């Protein structure tokens, strides 16, 4: 269970990370790429922030995530410059791809199909935790 402080820090980080990532996409002249930060969860000791990204189009998601992971220190520095008046110490950032939209789409497609996935549980993949 997240405390109010964790939620507030997560929302501050989320808002500023969106600006940083979208600014880098625009600055590098990459077209047809949308990066959104769907969720940021902060550990109880405020040392690690887990960032879930939705990247569209899905085909560029893995390579974009690798680029973001390789530039984590620069992103953290930019973030610390933006939130220096709100946070004493910026948590370490860990990035993951948010696959919840894909999972929801698979469920919708399975429910619209001929066989019922509620009766036959083998139709849907097990969701993996990241």
From Swiss-Prot:
For this protein, the record's InterPro entries field holds: KH_dom-like_a/b, RbfA, RbfA_dom_sf
Pfam families linked: RBFA
Question: Which terms under GO biological process does the entry name?
Answer: maturation of SSU-rRNA
Q: Which keywords accompany this UniProt record?
A: Cytoplasm, Ribosome biogenesis
Q: Which GO terms describe its cellular component?
A: cytosol
A GO molecular function annotation here is: ribosomal small subunit binding
Transmembrane region(s): none
Location(s) in or outside the cell: Cytoplasm
Q: Which Gene3D superfamilies match?
A: 3.30.300.20
Q: Which HAMAP family match?
A: RbfA
Family statement: Belongs to the RbfA family.
Complexes and interactors: Monomer. Binds 30S ribosomal subunits, but not 50S ribosomal subunits or 70S ribosomes.
Job description of the protein: One of several proteins that assist in the late maturation steps of the functional core of the 30S ribosomal subunit. Associates with free 30S ribosomal subunits (but not with 30S subunits that are part of 70S ribosomes or polysomes). Required for efficient processing of 16S rRNA. May interact with the 5'-terminal helix region of 16S rRNA.
What's the protein here called?
Ribosome-binding factor A
Designated gene of the protein: rbfA
